[in-house]
Protein backbone atom coordinates (compact mmCIF):
# COMPACT_ATOMS: atom_id res chain seq x y z
CA UNK A 1 0.00 0.00 0.00
CA UNK A 2 2.83 2.38 0.89
CA UNK A 3 4.57 1.64 -2.41
CA UNK A 4 1.37 2.32 -4.36
CA UNK A 5 0.88 5.62 -2.53
CA UNK A 6 4.49 6.60 -3.17
CA UNK A 7 4.10 5.81 -6.87
CA UNK A 8 0.85 7.79 -7.05
CA UNK A 9 2.56 10.82 -5.51
CA UNK A 10 5.40 10.60 -8.02
CA UNK A 11 2.97 10.33 -10.94
CA UNK A 12 0.99 13.34 -9.73
CA UNK A 13 4.19 15.35 -9.26
CA UNK A 14 5.33 14.42 -12.76
CA UNK A 15 1.92 15.39 -14.19
CA UNK A 16 2.09 18.94 -12.82
CA UNK A 17 5.75 19.24 -13.75
CA UNK A 18 4.84 18.31 -17.33
CA UNK A 19 2.12 20.96 -17.45
CA UNK A 20 4.56 23.65 -16.37
CA UNK A 21 7.29 22.45 -18.73
CA UNK A 22 4.91 22.33 -21.70
CA UNK A 23 3.86 25.92 -21.08
CA UNK A 24 7.17 27.45 -20.09
CA UNK A 25 10.11 25.49 -21.54
CA UNK A 26 10.77 25.99 -25.26
CA UNK A 27 12.66 23.33 -27.16
CA UNK A 28 16.42 23.61 -27.34
CA UNK A 29 16.82 23.42 -31.12
CA UNK A 30 16.14 26.93 -32.38
CA UNK A 31 16.40 28.02 -35.98
CA UNK A 32 19.03 30.60 -35.16
CA UNK A 33 21.06 28.21 -33.02
CA UNK A 34 23.94 26.06 -34.24
CA UNK A 35 21.91 22.86 -34.55
CA UNK A 36 19.01 24.69 -36.17
CA UNK A 37 21.32 26.23 -38.76
CA UNK A 38 22.80 22.83 -39.63
CA UNK A 39 19.34 21.31 -40.01
CA UNK A 40 18.31 24.16 -42.31
CA UNK A 41 21.52 23.86 -44.33
CA UNK A 42 21.26 20.11 -44.96
CA UNK A 43 17.54 20.31 -45.79
CA UNK A 44 17.96 23.11 -48.34
CA UNK A 45 21.18 21.82 -49.94
CA UNK A 46 19.77 18.31 -50.43
CA UNK A 47 16.09 19.19 -51.02
CA UNK A 48 14.94 17.04 -48.10
CA UNK A 49 11.20 17.59 -48.22
CA UNK A 50 9.77 14.48 -46.52
CA UNK A 51 10.63 14.71 -42.86
CA UNK A 52 9.88 12.82 -39.65
CA UNK A 53 10.40 14.61 -36.33
CA UNK A 54 10.44 12.33 -33.29
CA UNK A 55 9.78 14.32 -30.14
CA UNK A 56 7.48 17.30 -30.79
CA UNK A 57 7.77 18.56 -27.19
CA UNK A 58 5.60 21.70 -27.09
CA UNK A 59 6.33 22.48 -30.72
CA UNK A 60 8.56 25.48 -30.13
CA UNK A 61 11.94 23.83 -30.73
CA UNK A 62 12.95 21.61 -33.63
CA UNK A 63 9.37 21.18 -34.85
CA UNK A 64 8.88 24.91 -35.39
CA UNK A 65 12.31 25.12 -37.00
CA UNK A 66 11.46 22.34 -39.45
CA UNK A 67 8.09 23.87 -40.31
CA UNK A 68 9.57 27.30 -41.03
CA UNK A 69 12.42 25.91 -43.15
CA UNK A 70 10.05 23.80 -45.24
CA UNK A 71 7.43 26.50 -45.68
CA UNK A 72 9.94 29.15 -46.70
CA UNK A 73 11.91 27.04 -49.16
CA UNK A 74 9.60 24.47 -50.78
CA UNK A 75 6.17 24.50 -52.38
CA UNK A 76 5.59 20.81 -51.70
CA UNK A 77 6.72 19.04 -48.55
CA UNK A 78 5.59 16.70 -45.80
CA UNK A 79 6.35 16.88 -42.09
CA UNK A 80 5.21 14.33 -39.53
CA UNK A 81 6.01 15.10 -35.89
CA UNK A 82 5.34 12.57 -33.14
CA UNK A 83 4.82 13.11 -29.40
CA UNK A 84 3.96 10.46 -26.80
CA UNK A 85 2.92 12.84 -24.02
CA UNK A 86 -0.68 14.08 -24.26
CA UNK A 87 0.10 17.27 -22.36
CA UNK A 88 2.92 18.30 -24.69
CA UNK A 89 1.00 17.25 -27.80
CA UNK A 90 -1.94 19.44 -26.82
CA UNK A 91 0.34 22.40 -26.13
CA UNK A 92 2.13 21.92 -29.47
CA UNK A 93 -1.17 22.05 -31.35
CA UNK A 94 -1.91 25.32 -29.58
CA UNK A 95 1.55 26.82 -30.09
CA UNK A 96 1.77 25.94 -33.79
CA UNK A 97 -1.85 26.54 -34.76
CA UNK A 98 -0.93 29.50 -36.97
CA UNK A 99 1.59 27.43 -38.95
CA UNK A 100 -0.31 24.18 -39.49
CA UNK A 101 -1.61 23.07 -42.88
CA UNK A 102 -2.46 19.73 -44.57
CA UNK A 103 1.25 19.06 -45.24
CA UNK A 104 2.03 19.06 -41.51
CA UNK A 105 0.89 16.35 -39.12
CA UNK A 106 1.37 16.59 -35.37
CA UNK A 107 0.61 13.08 -34.15
CA UNK A 108 0.04 11.72 -30.66
CA UNK A 109 1.36 8.20 -30.30
CA UNK A 110 4.35 5.91 -30.14
CA UNK A 111 6.14 3.80 -32.73
CA UNK A 112 7.51 1.03 -30.51
CA UNK A 113 6.01 -1.29 -27.92
CA UNK A 114 6.69 -1.19 -24.20
CA UNK A 115 8.72 -4.40 -24.39
CA UNK A 116 11.06 -2.66 -26.86
CA UNK A 117 12.15 -0.23 -24.15
CA UNK A 118 15.31 -1.28 -22.29
CA UNK A 119 15.10 -3.24 -19.07
CA UNK A 120 16.38 -1.03 -16.25
CA UNK A 121 18.54 -3.91 -15.01
CA UNK A 122 20.46 -3.87 -18.30
CA UNK A 123 21.23 -0.15 -18.32
CA UNK A 124 24.80 0.83 -17.49
CA UNK A 125 23.81 4.07 -15.78
CA UNK A 126 27.34 5.19 -14.97
CA UNK A 127 28.70 4.60 -18.48
CA UNK A 128 25.73 6.45 -19.94
CA UNK A 129 26.15 9.46 -17.67
CA UNK A 130 23.08 8.67 -15.58
CA UNK A 131 22.36 7.90 -11.97
CA UNK A 132 20.08 5.04 -10.85
CA UNK A 133 17.38 7.55 -9.84
CA UNK A 134 16.99 8.38 -13.54
CA UNK A 135 15.08 5.12 -13.89
CA UNK A 136 12.06 7.28 -12.99
CA UNK A 137 12.21 8.65 -16.55
CA UNK A 138 11.75 5.12 -17.86
CA UNK A 139 8.84 4.52 -15.50
CA UNK A 140 7.13 7.68 -16.75
CA UNK A 141 7.79 6.66 -20.37
CA UNK A 142 6.01 3.36 -19.74
CA UNK A 143 3.12 5.15 -18.05
CA UNK A 144 2.70 7.43 -21.08
CA UNK A 145 3.04 4.55 -23.55
CA UNK A 146 0.11 2.78 -21.94
CA UNK A 147 -2.10 5.79 -22.71
CA UNK A 148 -1.38 6.14 -26.44
CA UNK A 149 -1.59 3.94 -29.52
CA UNK A 150 1.23 2.56 -31.63
CA UNK A 151 0.99 4.57 -34.86
CA UNK A 152 4.00 3.09 -36.66
CA UNK A 153 1.87 1.48 -39.38
CA UNK A 154 0.30 4.86 -40.14
CA UNK A 155 3.62 6.48 -41.03
CA UNK A 156 5.01 6.90 -44.55
CA UNK A 157 7.52 4.20 -45.47
CA UNK A 158 10.22 6.55 -46.78
CA UNK A 159 11.69 9.83 -45.54
CA UNK A 160 14.38 12.24 -46.64
CA UNK A 161 15.31 13.27 -43.11
CA UNK A 162 14.49 12.01 -39.62
CA UNK A 163 15.29 13.89 -36.43
CA UNK A 164 15.76 11.46 -33.55
CA UNK A 165 15.03 13.57 -30.48
CA UNK A 166 12.51 11.50 -28.54
CA UNK A 167 12.65 9.85 -25.16
CA UNK A 168 15.83 9.06 -23.29
CA UNK A 169 15.05 5.34 -23.25
CA UNK A 170 13.03 4.89 -26.45
CA UNK A 171 15.44 6.54 -28.86
CA UNK A 172 17.60 3.53 -29.77
CA UNK A 173 14.65 1.28 -30.61
CA UNK A 174 13.11 4.08 -32.66
CA UNK A 175 16.38 4.62 -34.49
CA UNK A 176 16.90 0.94 -35.21
CA UNK A 177 13.35 0.66 -36.54
CA UNK A 178 13.59 3.68 -38.82
CA UNK A 179 17.10 4.55 -39.95
CA UNK A 180 16.91 2.43 -43.12
CA UNK A 181 13.82 4.39 -44.22
CA UNK A 182 15.65 7.71 -44.55
CA UNK A 183 18.42 9.38 -46.53
CA UNK A 184 19.67 11.58 -43.69
CA UNK A 185 19.07 11.78 -39.96
CA UNK A 186 19.90 14.07 -37.07
CA UNK A 187 20.79 13.04 -33.52
CA UNK A 188 20.23 15.49 -30.69
CA UNK A 189 21.74 15.17 -27.20
CA UNK A 190 24.62 13.02 -28.43
CA UNK A 191 26.31 13.40 -25.05
CA UNK A 192 23.48 11.65 -23.18
CA UNK A 193 22.05 8.16 -22.83
CA UNK A 194 19.44 9.06 -25.44
CA UNK A 195 22.03 8.53 -28.19
CA UNK A 196 24.45 6.27 -26.28
CA UNK A 197 23.38 2.99 -27.91
CA UNK A 198 22.74 4.69 -31.26
CA UNK A 199 26.29 5.99 -31.49
CA UNK A 200 27.66 2.59 -30.48
CA UNK A 201 25.64 1.03 -33.29
CA UNK A 202 26.90 3.59 -35.81
CA UNK A 203 30.50 3.01 -34.75
CA UNK A 204 30.08 -0.77 -35.09
CA UNK A 205 28.42 -0.42 -38.50
CA UNK A 206 30.38 2.52 -39.83
CA UNK A 207 30.12 1.48 -43.48
CA UNK A 208 26.38 2.22 -43.36
CA UNK A 209 26.78 5.84 -42.30
CA UNK A 210 28.57 9.02 -43.27
CA UNK A 211 28.95 11.80 -40.71
CA UNK A 212 27.96 15.02 -42.46
CA UNK A 213 27.99 17.60 -39.65
CA UNK A 214 28.86 17.39 -35.98
CA UNK A 215 28.54 19.74 -33.03
CA UNK A 216 29.24 19.08 -29.37
CA UNK A 217 25.79 17.59 -28.73
CA UNK A 218 24.26 17.30 -32.21
CA UNK A 219 25.14 15.36 -35.37
CA UNK A 220 23.76 14.79 -38.85
CA UNK A 221 24.45 11.59 -40.79
CA UNK A 222 23.83 10.33 -44.29
CA UNK A 223 22.69 6.73 -44.65
CA UNK A 224 24.81 4.80 -47.16
CA UNK A 225 22.61 2.37 -49.07
Question: Across the structure, where does each feature detected by a protein language model lie?
Answer:
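A short alpha-helical cap/connector motif
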Residues: 1-186, 190-225
Amino acid sequence: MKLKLKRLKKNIKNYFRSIQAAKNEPGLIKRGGEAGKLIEKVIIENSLINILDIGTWNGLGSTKTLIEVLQENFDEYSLVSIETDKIFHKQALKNLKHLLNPSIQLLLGRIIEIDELPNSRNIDFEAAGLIPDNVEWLIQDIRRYKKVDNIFDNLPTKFDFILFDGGEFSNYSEFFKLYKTTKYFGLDDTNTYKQYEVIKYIENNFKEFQLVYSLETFSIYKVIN
